[in-house]
Amino acid sequence: DTLAAPAPSIRAMALSFEFFPPKTDEQRQQLDRTVEKLKTFSPRFVSVTFGAGGSTLSYTPETIRHLREQHGLDAAPHLSCVGGTRAEIIDLLERYRAMGCTRLVALRGDLPSGMGSLGELRYAEDLVRLVRAEFGDAFHIEVGAYPEVHPQADDALADLRHFASKMAAGADSAITQYFYNADAYFRFVDAARAAGVTQPILPGIMPISNYTQLKRFSEGCGAEIPRWFGKRMAAFGDDVEGLRSYPADVVAELCRRLLAGGAPELHFYTLNLAKPT
């Protein structure tokens, strides 16, 4: 619905999509249906998460292989450094390189439940440096960015400095956490440029399919839901059509503003669902 709304401008832009690795046959079929629909937009690449706390890490490589071999997509694995050793991370990178992967998303990740140590690499910056030291330019490295500040950052300035350090360590581009205030993205990009960051910063877009779920996600990741949006959603009451169409219109307008303001690409967090996207 979001991509359909501003079709002329969106289809002409570079797009990318995030998927999560399915665990069951039903989820695999759902992912295939979603990919079949979304790949008609010719995404520049797609990414595959590893799950909270590494919970689906074992499913990520097989999903990457499936997307590459069955759908012909440039699939980039998310890679976390938390809880792993340098040797384990290098081994996984070797596996991805053998598959033909030339892109990855380097993240710190969340500490798995019950694990008391962050591991040998504490931050995404350390992971970026490891990839560059061991593999040179074999991978295009994406990192995360937080226009509305990382929830664990001391403040906005500290967060910006950390982001700039990741980029200086060798990242090629960044993908932001989702947001619904375009000005937050533009302010962040301006601040990053002033801090010396020259690489592309791709805005992350979260289509809205379940408002209750969105609120829960946002509380955990620090993304702000504008007050006016929450009030408007509450005003729809039992109006099912309004509850479906209004969020799509809001996200489509956000995309228009981002494109008009010079965003280099739109990266959609699909939740493996085609229709909201």
Predicted features by range, described:
Residues 2-48:
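Conserved N-terminal beta1-alpha1 strand-loop-helix module at the mouth
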Residues 14-30, 75-87, 140-158, 235-249:
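Active-site mouth loops of central-metabolism enzymes
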Residues 18, 46, 96, 166, ...:
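Conserved, mostly hydrophobic/aromatic
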Residues 19-22, 49-53, 78-84, 109-111, ...:
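Active-site beta-loop-alpha junctions enriched in small/polar residues
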Residues 25-38, 60, 86-94, 154-165, ...:
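Short, acidic/polar
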Residues 26, 119-146, 195-248, 253-254:
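Active-site pocket-lining/capping segments in soluble small-molecule metabolic enzymes
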Residues 27-28, 54-66, 85-91, 110-131, ...:
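Active-site-adjacent beta->alpha loops and helix N-cap segments on the catalytic face
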Residues 47, 105-106, 175, 267:
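Conserved beta-strand positions in the central sheet of alpha/beta enzyme cores
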